[in-house]
Structure formats: C-alpha cells, structure tokens
C-alpha cells in the first residue's frame, strides 16, 4: 500500500475557546465575517484550481493512493459535489488556502478539472486548526498519530486542555489522553501504526512496555488480537519501574488503569498512580509543595 505523505505540524500561536462543533464554529464566523475588500464570503462559487493552496498545518498528512484514485474517478463522473472550504491566502494575494477538503482538491487535479467549487471564510489560525481536526476526526480520516499530533499542537501552541479538546471533537477525555500517549512510542512502532500493521489498541497496550519494538514485531508476526496483546504486555517488563521488589518483573498497567490515572490527575492537577493487587490496591497522589497538599486536603474535605 502506497501513501502520499505531506506536511509537518507547526502552527502560529493564537487563543480561542473550544468546546463547540464544526457547524457552531462556522456559524459563529458567518455571524460576523471580517470581509476583505473584493472577497466574496458566504456562498459557494467556482474558482480556478491553481489558485488554491494546501494548508501546511493541515492535521492530515497521509493520503492513501487508492482512496485518491477512487475519488478522482467519482469526480470525473459526477464532479465535486461539496464545496472546498477555503480562506484568503495569508501569503499570496488573490489566492486561497484550503481549510477543509484537500483530498477533494487533490482528486480533482487528478481528474483533470480546471475549476472547483469553493466557499470562502475569514478564519484565524486556531479556527483553521479546529476545523481541520473536527472534520478529519469525525470522518475518521486521520491516522491515530496525526490525531495525536493535532491534540498536542492544540495543547502546546494554543494552551487548550484535554477536556476542551474532548468536548470539541465529541470524544472522551481519556480517549484524548490515551491517543496522545502514542507519541511517546519509538519511531519504528509508530511506522507500524501508520502502515496499518498495528492498530491503536495494540499500540496502547504496549505503550508502557520496556521494549515496545520487540513486542510490536511479535504482535505482527503472530497476528495477535488486541486482547492477546494486552495479555502479552502484562507479562513484559514495565518501562518505568525496572525490577520490582524481590527481583520480580513489575506489572504492566492496562489501558483502563492508565486512563483512570490520567482522569484523576487532570481533575486534581497532581500526579496519580494506581496499583492493583488482586481485589485491593493503592492510590498514590504525589504533591510537590505544601501548598499543593493543603489545596488537596481542602478539596477532599469539602468534595471535589
């Protein structure tokens, strides 16, 4: 299977509230457009295909050849049925940058079209990123690493929280947290994810292993299911703990435990560790200052 890989993450900074869907975001833009002189905003129209530019910050970087070919065949027969969402190019006067619909634009070029329908919006960089993530995640067009990188950019560049992101895309906060953990996997394991040799479920199961590359190869060679992978990972040494007391290999936490740790950590603002021992276990909350301890005690006594 061949893929066309384009673009690299890296956004200009800006701040804007999340927690709303694509239609709400576009509705907000329509309510108060910042129209540049001579720009036609709102309705769709035909535009020469060569004046459209891809967005270098597009969350989706991989386009499967077979998907592009199928879409180009459909476009030859029926045309581009949905307008491509664009904004005025920030770099070149008279041209437009694609906000949503790059796959249609690429397929239209293959189909030999000279013009495509576009819909122009005035959007800032954060709105462009939000729309790109929402469109691709809701359509399952992003691979899991592209999805994780998009979340990382929103958090690091635009100071969004995992809860904000989860509300925007309609996923759980633990889904966002678990997806972002995959960025810590070695490059070789990440390449298996992109190629489809491993699923996100496989990758999450081995994320805490001391040697995820070896486990990944074993999973691929054995054709293991996610459940079989989780059982395999529980027997493997953990990355963080090394050897446990008595020289026994430490237990690998399952994805549910890791997600619960992340949820509690997000609520408390402190590092949280959960260790199961049969039907019992230990919940450890780590604080760095006495002020954090005092705040934790106050919150626990009055109810979080």
Swiss-Prot record:
SUPFAM superfamilies: KorB DNA-binding domain-like, ParB/Sulfiredoxin
Coiled coil: none
Region of interest (Disordered), residue spans: 236-257
CDD domains referenced in this protein's UniProt entry, alphabetically: SPO0J_N
GO biological process, one term: chromosome segregation
Keywords for this protein: Chromosome partition, Cytoplasm, DNA-binding
Pfam families according to UniProt: HTH_ParB, ParB_dimer, ParBc
InterPro entries cross-referenced by the UniProt entry: Chromosome_partition/occlusion (IPR050336), HTH_ParB/Spo0J (IPR041468), ParB/RepB/Spo0J (IPR004437), ParB/Sulfiredoxin_dom (IPR003115), ParB/Sulfiredoxin_sf (IPR036086), ParB_dimer_C (IPR057240)
Molecular function GO terms recorded: DNA binding
Annotated localization: Cytoplasm
Domain of life: Bacteria
Any one of the GO CC terms: cytoplasm
Cited PANTHER family: CHROMOSOME-PARTITIONING PROTEIN PARB-RELATED
Homology family: Belongs to the ParB family.
Function, as annotated: Involved in chromosome partition. Localize to both poles of the predivisional cell following completion of DNA replication. Binds to the DNA origin of replication.
Protein's name according to its UniProt entry: Chromosome-partitioning protein ParB
């Amino acid at each position: 299977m061949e893929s066309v890989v384009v673009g690299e993450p890296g956004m200009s900074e800006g701040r804007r509230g999340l927690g709303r869907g694509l239609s709400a975001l576009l509705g907000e833009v329509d309510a108060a457009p910042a129209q540049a002189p001579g720009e036609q905003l709102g309705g769709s129209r035909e535009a020469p295909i060569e004046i459209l530019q891809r967005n270098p910050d597009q969350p989706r970087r991989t386009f499967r050849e077979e998907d592009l070919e199928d879409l180009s065949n459909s476009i030859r027969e029926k045309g581009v049925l949905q307008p491509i969402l664009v904004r005025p190019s920030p770099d070149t006067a008279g041209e437009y940058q694609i906000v949503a619909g790059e796959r249609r634009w690429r397929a239209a070029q293959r189909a030999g079209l000279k013009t495509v329908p576009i819909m122009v919006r005035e959007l800032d960089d954060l709105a462009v990123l939000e729309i790109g993530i929402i469109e691709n995640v809701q359509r399952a067009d992003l691979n899991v690493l592209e999805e994780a990188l998009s979340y990382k950019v929103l958090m690091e560049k635009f100071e969004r929280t995992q809860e904000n992101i989860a509300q925007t895309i309609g996923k759980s906060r633990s889904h966002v947290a678990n997806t972002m953990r995959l960025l810590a996997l070695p490059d070789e394991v990440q390449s298996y994810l992109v190629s489809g040799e491993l699923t996100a479920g496989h990758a999450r199961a081995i994320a805490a292993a001391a040697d995820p590359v070896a486990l990944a190869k074993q999973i691929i060679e054995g054709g293991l299911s996610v459940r079989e992978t989780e059982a395999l990972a529980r027997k493997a040494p953990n990355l963080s703990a090394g050897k446990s007391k008595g020289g026994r290999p430490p237990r690998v936490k399952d994805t549910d435990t890791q997600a619960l740790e992340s949820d509690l950590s997000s609520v408390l603002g402190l590092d949280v560790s959960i260790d199961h021992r049969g039907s019992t276990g230990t919940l450890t909350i780590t604080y760095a200052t006495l002020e954090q301890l005092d705040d934790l005690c106050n919150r626990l006594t009055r109810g979080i």
